[in-house]
Amino acid sequence: MRQASPKPEGLRERNRREKHEHITNVSIRLFLENGYDATTLAEIAYSSGISRRHLFNYFDSKDEILFSHLREYYEMIAESIARGSPGEPAMEVVRKAILSNLARFDAERTLAIAKIMKNNTALQSKNRANEINLEKAILRGLSTLWPDRESHDRLLFASILSSGAIRFATHIWLRDENEMKLADCVADAFDRMMFEIQCTQ
Amino acid sequence: MRQASPKPEGLRERNRREKHEHITNVSIRLFLENGYDATTLAEIAYSSGISRRHLFNYFDSKDEILFSHLREYYEMIAESIARGSPGEPAMEVVRKAILSNLARFDAERTLAIAKIMKNNTALQSKNRANEINLEKAILRGLSTLWPDRESHDRLLFASILSSGAIRFATHIWLRDENEMKLADCVADAFDRMMFEIQCTQ
DNA sequence: GGCCATTAGTGCACAGAGTGCAGTTTAATT
DNA sequence: AATTAAACTGCACTCTGTGCACTAATGGCC
């Protein structure tokens, strides 16, 4: 182990992270006020106090402003899965990883983004496209835990089912807003699937 | 019943369909030759013998050129599911609908498009986003078959699982190109899921 | 402190996707 | 033949995203 992982985080790194956060917040506010399509990158840049050109040093695209915060969350999931117990069924490992990382899930921001996506089918599609990254992260984690090549298809299958369960849970959670806690929705969705599936490992 | 459904298909309608097909073929050829990103709509229009502006009377966007042919296929699936037997488990109805419509699935075009998407992650994402339409179509079909509101969540769950199985099947089929028939891949994927799932209906 | 490499940040010009609009041509209907 | 709707074109425009050349700020190092 080389120097563990704390990393002192330099001033520059911190500034960057904070500005990244700032731009995201400004953007979400503008999206909520005027709609996603009607908000141009020029406006976002102006309201954030930077040049339009410089936006692309923080986000690769307009969509990324909404979805990039999920990237590190997905990465955490992958790592958490990789640290799971190989004796358990794959789905159970994923379930535990999701539930144990739920505290780090930014529910408030997700709710705001869901509001922005409402009535914008193009954005919903992009959101869906982004979910492929969750599935890939799950698969990556599972493949680390069970590196043998012959189990790859089984793990792919498990990652598809898992991300399906998560999507189902999120859907219920967003629909019955505030009626259920996200953790319960996720637990229910996995329960439902685990109950119906005889996970033969 | 008013006039049934045969519809004589007027000359105009037919011309439109043929031109639609023609543009698609031209585009796929260009995409294969020069890549998706490097092929502009202006080139496609020129090679198709129409104006760039007029392309948008056939396709809403560049992506649509690749994905629109799936639209009517998905619609067939939905109708086929809606005609299923309500006594069977939902997953079984979907499985039968997929398998019985497989002859109408344009495998050749799908292979070409898969080739185009290879090494283009943005396009893969868009492809993934498009799959939400299959899931919606499945859910639509199932909801027609079981219109009672209280089973909606169960049907949503089934549509997520089904489209997951289809995606798994397609993945295997594309990976082991020509090694297995698509029908077998689909059957296997559903078998696998139906075997592992105790479909309690 | 002063030098230096790196990173933050700007401005400009450009390409390509997609839209609105005003207009012309073509084809089906009566 | 006249009418009407659809096919089709051209133009000007907006917005996203990129390449490039450039300046400003910052951290490390002597």
Tell me the role of every PLM-derived stretch:
Chain A
Residues 63-65:
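A secondary-structure capping/hinge motif
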Residues 50-59:
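Short hydrophobic/aromatic patch on the recognition helix
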Residues 1-34, 38-50, 67, 76:
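Basic, helix-initiating cap at the start of DNA-binding domains
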Residues 75-115:
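Hydrophobic alpha-helical connector segments
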Residues 108-137, 148:
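Short secondary-structure transition hinges
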Residues 133-158:
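Hydrophobic alpha-helical bundle segments that form small-molecule/ligand-binding pockets
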Residues 155-179, 195-201:
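Amphipathic C-terminal alpha-helical segment
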Residues 1-6, 140, 178-201:
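C-terminal peripheral helix-coil segments that are non-catalytic and often amphipathic
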